[in-house]
Amino acid sequence: MEPSAFYTMKGYELAADTQITTAMEDYLEMLCRLQREGRPLRVNVLAESLHVRPSSASKMLGNLKGLGYIDFQKYGAVEVTEKGLREGEYLLHRHQVLHRFFCAVNGTEDELEQVEKIEHFMNRETVNNLEQLLARMGIR
């Protein structure tokens, strides 16, 4: 892609050539959040946490398993793999950095919706730079 040329969102997504979709990121991030909280990693818990049907959660878990992010058997517990943990920890970190940023900018305590809408479109370098900016501004 030409660096200064405009493309559609789909064009940027295709050029990124990533295996994990934005929806998969949401599921993996939630699995890692549930694991941090000590909650069981089961289809019904995941579905409830994301406000989706268990069948939708089960299908997405199959996709994540196919990419090596998780292991699970139908009707069994979900286990996040090392690969999944690495990516999931980054997703949680990215979420936290953006949440701090939006709360500071908007002077609020909760910017969940804002973060959820934008987090998938921020690359690692931008998240890192934003984190450094927040640190320089004394925003923790």
Go through each PLM region and give its residues.
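N-terminal leader segment of winged-helix/HTH proteins
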Residues: M1-T21
